[in-house]
Amino acid sequence: MTEQVTDHNLLKHRFRGYLPVIIDVETAGLNAKTDALLELAAITVKMDQQGYLVPDQKCHFHIQPFENANINADSLKFNGIDIHNPLRGAVAEAIAIPEMFKMVRRAIKEQGCQRAVIVAHNATFDQAFLQAAVKRINAKRDPFHPFAMFDTASLAGLMYGQTVLVKACQIANIAFDGKQAHSALYDTEKTTELFCAMVNRLKDLGGFPLLNPK
């Protein structure tokens, strides 16, 4: 009987059938239940022919504060968002989140995965705001695992000894423009580069696949 060989250059075999999706949110505070979600970006990943992780599809939305949302002025000053600027082109949560879900479900199908898992820097924050918005709009067919996540702050601490995004990027030789930080799209792009760099470095060091898996 021929032993089945696992192709580790396929993404579906790298994370137990999960598709990593890197996200970042910008908000009007720290409380996911009461404070407004103002910006959301997401990037999927794929494997190249050599089994290295690379960025794939992306989406980005400016989001209108939900009804009666709390707006913390200090948070707006920190992220530089002017919620009254018509040029933001902000859309409702009920538009942005289902559109992001469509992109993720499409990527899951393309990569032969079963479900998505959130990847983010200090991921509990982003996951909490996304889940709160999903609950507010009663979104259907959520492709994400309800509690599993990959936190790049923790992973970068392990790989590089740095937990701050910009410092981890510097150690990983990833260019980082501090003036563009706290834009959800830019931060997601840099977090994606960092996540891919860490996964690929582990591959180069012989850390995956395991030579003698039990």
From Swiss-Prot:
One of its GO terms (molecular function) is nucleic acid binding. It is an enzyme of class 3 (hydrolase). GO terms for biological process: DNA replication proofreading; tRNA processing. Mg(2+) 1 binds at D24. The record marks F78, F125, F147 as: Important for substrate binding and specificity. InterPro entries: Exonuclease_RNaseT/DNA_pol3, RNase_T, RNaseH-like_sf, RNaseH_sf. The keyword Nuclease applies. SUPFAM superfamilies: Ribonuclease H-like. Mg(2+) 2 binds at D24, E26, H182, D187. Its cofactor is Mg(2+). GO terms for cellular component: cytosol. Keywords: Exonuclease, Hydrolase, Magnesium, Metal-binding, Nuclease, tRNA processing. The active site is at H182. It holds the Pfam family RNase_T. Its EC number is 3.1.13.-. Residues 21-195 form the Exonuclease domain. It comes from the Bacteria. Homodimer. NCBIfam families: RNaseT. PANTHER family: DNA POLYMERASE III SUBUNIT EPSILON (PTHR30231), RIBONUCLEASE T (PTHR30231:SF2). Belongs to the RNase T family. Trims short 3' overhangs of a variety of RNA species, leaving a one or two nucleotide 3' overhang. Responsible for the end-turnover of tRNA: specifically removes the terminal AMP residue from uncharged tRNA (tRNA-C-C-A). Also appears to be involved in tRNA biosynthesis. This is Ribonuclease T. It comes from Haemophilus ducreyi (strain 35000HP / ATCC 700724).
